[in-house]
Amino acid sequence: MFNYIMADNNFDVVVCVGPHDFNIVSLSMCYTRKNVIGYRNIYLVSSDPNINIEGAITIDEKIFPFSKKDLIDQFGNNERNGWYLQQLLKFYSGLVIPGILERYLIIDSDTFFLNPTKFITDDGKHYITTGTEYHKPYFLHMNRLHYSLKKMHSSSGISHHSFFHTIRVKGLMTLVEDYFSNEKPFWKIFLDMIDPNEFMDSGASEYEIYFTYMHLYYPDEICVRELKWENCSRLGPDCVTKNDFVSIHWYSRK
């Protein structure tokens, strides 16, 4: 089974872009096209279907089975809704985007790969890059999704990108939906299990969930690695020269 799944090393790239990053995604995409090794297509998932960036296929987020309105209805109209929405867009991209390959690399729209970087090993495993973050509410949330999901690795799965395999994402969704007696779809359970007291801070992480699931159930399909990276305020020489990639979040830009 493993050899069958890993026989095809092609993959696509998915970038979810929100209003905060409309002014930076064109530049980050230049670095993606230059330094991500081996991709086929780049899909840009956006609330603005008219956004047009060279080398990318724009996907209207309206084709997904949920919307920002679902979050507004549940949590009220607030600035964090978009942050949780993009997490769900990442999970569902492999199920919704027409013609997307089974494997896809998620890259945050404010993340810049500075050096040529591989994402699949020679024997077909997915590289997953680790970070150092630890935020307890992430693990409390995933454990509410399913009792088996708990911190399994000393490092974090958060590094502003991740490599998803649709067959494994489906497995994760089925695990959670079955646990909740198939009464609701995964995306609704994901939202329901966010602690309201943590919502406005950071109450869930798609990257930690997927990293934990793969490390627990399919460790032979991933290769955990460390790259040099950091969060920066600008794309300056102080960051560029010492890192493999950087992220420049909207709230810290100079």
Residue ranges and their predicted role:
Residues 1-69, 250-254:
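N-terminal anchoring/stem segment of glycosyltransferases
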Residues 18-22, 48-51, 63-65, 109-114, ...:
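Short, solvent-exposed loop/turn segments at secondary-structure junctions
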Residues 33, 94, 173, 177, ...:
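Non-transmembrane alpha-helical segments in soluble domains
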Residues 53-96:
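Active-site-proximal specificity loops/subdomain of glycosyltransferases
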Residues 83-91, 110, 203-208:
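Conserved glycosyltransferase catalytic-site signature
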Residues 89-130:
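GT-A fold catalytic core of metal-dependent nucleotide-sugar glycosyltransferases
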Residues 117-195:
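Conserved catalytic core of nucleotide-sugar-dependent glycosyltransferases
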Residues 185-254:
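A glycosyltransferase accessory/donor-loop signature
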